[in-house]
Amino acid sequence: MTVFVGIGDAAHDTSIAALIDGEFKYRKSERNLGVKHHEASENWYKQTLNDWGVDKPDRLCYTDKGKVRGGKSVRKPYNGEDAIIEGDSVCIDHHTAHLHSTLSNAEQHAVFDGRGSGGNNGRYTGLIVTPDEKIRYKHLGVGKMLTYLGHVLDFKGLKVDFPGKIMGLQAYGTPDLELASQINQDNILDLCEPWIKKGVTSKDKDFQNFVATVHKACELIQLDYFSKFDPDKLIACSGGVMLNTVINTELRKKYKLYIPPHVYDGGLSIGALRYAVGKDFEIPNFPYIQDDWAPEEPSDQTIDEAAELLAQGHIIGWYQGHGELGPRALGNRSILMNPTIPNGKDILNERVKKREWWRPFGASVLHEAASKYFDIDDSPYMLYNSNVLVNGLDPITHVDGTCRHQTVSEASNSSFYRLLSKFEEKTGLPILLNTSLNVGGKPIASDKNSAMVDGLDCIFFGNEKCTKIS
């Protein structure tokens, strides 16, 4: 048996990936243990390998929470006399793992990390790789800048979620372009201080404008970073900041981007595995690769019943196959709803999701019909914002007229494609509101128990329909 292992040992969203005689395996600790953004212990990695029947990998590569100095790990849990996992091992820095995680042969690679690489004393937020050069981009991580705004509003929960929440709020404000061009790592804290003293809320219009201004500053920083690339050649992108759909959409207007769904730290293990193997490899059924419980494929009868319930206005859970890679629901771990229901966003939020009032919901659309409803017709991983081209889709239309949508083809997700097609047959609309199968503060579901979310009318596990949710 030949075994290669990659460990994404980070401060949050830890994971492990392996090639075992060519068979790909992936497990994320938050899904496995039910703790959002979980940071795994070394023993969890060892237990996972035991579950997979692995005792001693032929080659193991790991990231050491960004704490690499001169190519050497600060701590040595996977090598030396005290190693908890025996085998040939190497430690790589955070950015290097992100870079390899794209599994792309693109000539240009961009790593844009939210907080900077600890492997370089926390000073660098970006890594640019072109055929001619490698450039460390020195700037305070834009994710950290947006996190400060979450502290101003006294957000609860984990700060790794703050930038995503701010991304939704910025649409309610109007940026001051002159100020945005001046905001940097030296003055951001001073600019936030008056708002902290004032004690603002998310509905304060002046603060919404400030949020929009800081977000615009982050966009300008990232546009400057990308200006070093050749816009005519593909850029493979990674790093948690690349989950920002607003900025991604601006970049897309000028550059050819490949952004995989696992750009965040949950993809580090895949990058570490790529480094261990030394070459790209195929991942079957990508991105539906979570090591979790998977029910049987739904029948045509089940698809018809689910589509009918959605057409009638019910909110349903949709748990099919293995879970998707990354933080976005892509049709296997989803809460679904008819996107034409009046006040649908508020109904869903009050009954089920219980998120901040300003945060929008995404949508999924049949790939071949996308251009009729959105101005971006290819978005398989929900990583761009598109302008909504028709009226009457209020539950999925943000205040700025955009929607973060997923395009679904039969090849990408057959079961979900069939459901969307059947819903279109019943309603004339090939779109469903799609949000992740979880509630605030919890990870996306990985088994029956975690999927039984209060407030759903019903949930489908393959062909099994459950109606007693709470």
Roles of regions detected by a PLM:
Residues 42, 46, 61-86:
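Phosphate- and other anionic-substrate recognition elements at nucleic-acid/protein interfaces
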Residues 6-38, 76-87, 91-99, 104-178, ...:
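Flexible beta->alpha loop and helix N-cap segments adjacent to enzyme active/binding sites
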Residues 89, 204-220, 409, 413:
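Short acidic-aromatic active-site loops that bind/stabilize oxyanions
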Residues 212-235:
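Phosphate/ATP-binding catalytic cores across multiple sugar-kinase/actin-like superfamilies
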Residues 29-55:
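N-terminal phosphate-binding loop and adjacent alpha-helix
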Residues 1-5:
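Extreme N-terminal starter segment of soluble prokaryotic enzymes
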Residues 54-68, 232-240, 317:
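Short glycine-rich phosphate-binding loop at a beta-alpha junction
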Residues 176-206:
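A mobile "lid/hinge" subdomain adjacent to the ATP/sugar-phosphate binding pocket shared
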